[in-house]
Amino acid sequence: KPEGKEATWLFTHVTDLIHYANRSWYRYDLIGPENLQYSIYKVGSFYSEHIDTLYKNQHCRKLSFTVQLSNPDEYEGGEVEVYNGEKPIVLGKEIGSMYFFPSYMVHEVKPVTRGTRKALVGWVHGPQWK
């Protein structure tokens, strides 16, 4: 787990990418990210279909993201699927890749069948939708 300077560098880099993605694709009214979550999925681990929208006071999660930390050769299964209509969008497994999607989109992590999948996930808050 990153601490100290490593954590500061990582959080700064992720924040820069959040701003870039939002400017390029979403243009949401955002305030800032929650603390990052380091996720470990071992054989049999999964996360069933859900949405990330969470309301706190006058703010809500608007943008979700995941960063692939494992080499795809180190595990099987564990695909992240985001639903946008009938067919899910399966996110890539390339180590270091970062994917963004609106927090209101249904998504899931399929069961890991071999090895361990590691990822960094997070959410960005903004004022409630108008």
Predicted ranges, named:
Residues K1-M98, Y104-K130:
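Fe(II)/2-oxoglutarate oxygenase catalytic core
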